[in-house]
Amino acid sequence: LTYTRRKHRWIRGDWQLLPWLTTMVPGPDGPEPNRLSLLSRWKIFDNLRRSTLEVAQLLFFVIGWTLLPGAPLRWTLLGLGAVAAPWIISLLLALVRPPLDRSWRPYYGAVGRDLVTSAQQLGLTLVFLAHQAWISVDAIARTLWRMGVTRRRLLEWQTASLVERAWHR
């Protein structure tokens, strides 16, 4: 629960930076030119993109099962491949690049243990995909509503220690 609250808080904070992707940004005396570098803007954009990944993954599964042509199994496997790609790439790199300064048996034993851990992480990622997508949608929608409509409670921040204490009560 602490992780989820922290993630929600961070996504809200990232989306409050949305105006900083434009050429004019809020200033103390009204709009002023944005002085952020292109790299800084790219980092903001990348955080926004990353906050929508679980939503996009879940939508891909749902649309593949309901609207896309062909067998739903094909779309499911494609979606699973996309979710598993980081783990698969890491495993393949570990298999083809063994260290030269260590013996292979302990190394590949560790790779095997990492494979089991990665499979467990992948399973949990899939089990919690809908929940994590909901957390992201809620955080994004709440922020956009507050920024565009109510203009209230934009700085609804809690420190990690406050979140942790609230959970343990």
Language-model features, listed with the residues they occupy:
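Alpha-helical transmembrane segments and their membrane-interface junctions
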Residues: A130-I140
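Non-transmembrane catalytic domains and loops of membrane-associated enzymes and transporters
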Residues: L1-L122, L126-Q132, R146-S161
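Juxtamembrane membrane-water interface segments that cap and precede transmembrane helices
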Residues: V163-A166
